[in-house]
Amino acid sequence: MKYDVLFVHPQNYGNLQTYLKLPSLELCQISAVLNQNGYSNKLVDCFIDGHDIQELDNMLPIESPRIVLIYCSEYNHINALHTAYYLAQRYPNALIGILGMIVTFIPEYLLKRYPF
């Protein structure tokens, strides 16, 4: 199935992998609004499901989505940026976006450090 939007919630970094296992409510809320308005979307939650970036390939749709949104928190920002780079390579025609606390506070720094 081809999705309009693919949401990815990467695994937390290092020893924070078991810290407070909660789904990203932000992604769930955005998904609900998209569903109500007729957009197809899929959530790949590596954090809740316990998958790392090496296992991500098996969970992703084959066809490129139009938009990929990656959730980036203070606990997973390193993995989120690596995931964003990987997904930009896998889906070169998709618009890649990162949302969350870290990118809100230091967007210029992240854009300079990770220009993918």
Task: Give names to the regions the model predicted.
Residues 1, 21-22:
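N-lobe entry segment of adenylate-forming
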Residues 3-16:
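Nucleotide-activated donor-dependent transferases that construct or modify glycoconjugates
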Residues 1-5, 50-52:
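Short N-terminal or domain-adjacent regulatory/targeting segments
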Residues 20, 26, 33-116:
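Glycine-rich beta-alpha loop elements in corrinoid/cobalamin-binding modules
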